[in-house]
């Protein structure tokens, strides 16, 4: 447990949830902890037993809170602050960007939302290396040479959404760019979906199955081609090798005809962004699109409603008993690895 510099009378808390992916957990943790520091509050993490990185990452359950107050706080129900989100019916997603209103909190709150903007770190990315300490043995075991590029392929449930899954051309163009720009010709695949990766990249070594190994490989790579998944952000940003990263332009709606960044929160200034045509853009070529997207939501989205009122449409999934779904999904993935996983 790290030393407590001061004891705050107010706290910000967040909770790890059932079904929440590791990337989303790390964003919720890091953003809430950073905001608590900014506001001079204590920090409290709830649901640590649901942390998907506990086998290889060390994090703090509370910061700047006395043990007595921590025990008391665990029994309290705090008021909730919901990060502002924008439902975009044309892109069919909930979009977010830096919610500056959270800085106006003057009392203890529980934060709920995605909180995936770098602006929540207030210009200090280096502190992430203190927030997340990776197990040295796991990192050493998964260290890779500097002349290998990691392809962080996301499959799984992404394959059910044609607007979300990245086309094979994205990966082919990114490999070509790595070769032409940096002379890289060796590639390694890190993925949550081994069968899908084997279908797409049969010629490459694949790291899959153990999330700690996947995280550590990304944390040691000098060159990375990222998917539009939140998982890769923290192993890349805490990587001591200052990696070169190519990521998909517009993020979760690659090549969308509206040319909106989906979401503006998921724009990271020091990454390279590749379009559907294979062209690479830096911050200068993308920041205008990001700012235009934010302005569009600010000017056009001014009606609030509860999440239950959003039109989610009908899904055949509701007709399948919950206990049977993972077994059916696994069975079908053997026959349709590029569609189901």
Residues of each region from the PLM?
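Donor-binding and catalytic core of enzymes assembling or modifying cell-surface/extracellular glycoconjugates
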Residues: 22, 168-172, 177-266
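Histidine-anchored nucleotide/phosphate-binding helix
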Residues: 26-37, 172, 176
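A short beta-strand-loop structural module common to alpha/beta enzyme folds
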Residues: 41-51, 191
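Catalytic binding pocket for nucleotide-activated donors in carbohydrate/polymer assembly enzymes
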Residues: 237-305
